Amino acid sequence: MVNKNDEFKLNITGYTSEGGGVGKFHGQAIFVENTAVGDEILCHIIKAKKTYAIGKAMKIIKPSKSRIEPECDAFKSCGGCSFGHIKYEEELKYKAQKVEDAFKRIGGISPAFKPIISSPETTRYRNKAQYPVRRENGILNIGFYAKKSHRVIDGGDCLLQPEDFTKIIEIFKAWINENNITVYNEEIGIGLLRHIYLRKAFATGEIMVCTVINGISLPNSEELLEKLKSVAGFKTLVVNINREKTNVVLGEKCLNLYGDGYITDILCGVKITLSPHSFYQVN
């Protein structure tokens, strides 16, 4: 059994359901984030339990053939994606194996599986993003939650989102700072701006901007609107009111400040209208 602060060499032999690496040390499972199958690492134990332990890769002694350098600078801290450090082919292999294992373990059957179909697009494919807005030590952060926390990591130019979203977030940062807009403090439940919720219809190019606020109105919205009009495809600005102390992003009530309050996409020849509350597969 390993103990906290132990250090040893570890070979990563599998992945967890969340995409982290796992290896065995004297029969005990050791979970290590940001590792790839085939990595040989120097592992430092940060939490030890009877049946498993959580480690940190202090050094990659021998990198896996599947390992790549993450394109995103925030990958190690941001919880937005799990596989930025491995080749796309390895990611597909893992996902296919995960499905097959579920059929065998849970269903007790072993059907024949066709090869997984790869996507031609591995970046910029998501049509929706919900950005929490926070201040930490006076610094404004708009991005995604850090792994296993509600601390917000500034998203920068997230490679999973359309480039238009990055421009919109920069507009919001300037507008917030120039107009002293308060941002939500989750611990005490005060502050106005909670989330920025963006949607893009890829077939039409239309973009919806929704601000989620802990209040009843959005101050200086005219200035924000004029800046948003510089974004190609911007179609509508909606304010969603959520005054509950909750982790749920959207409240029930929406106010339409500009446009129709929805955007239109086309999927398999069918025209679809999308409001803030619409369910639509994100990728």
Question: What do these predicted regions represent?
Answer:
Residues 2-282:
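Accessory RNA-recognition modules of RNA-modification enzymes
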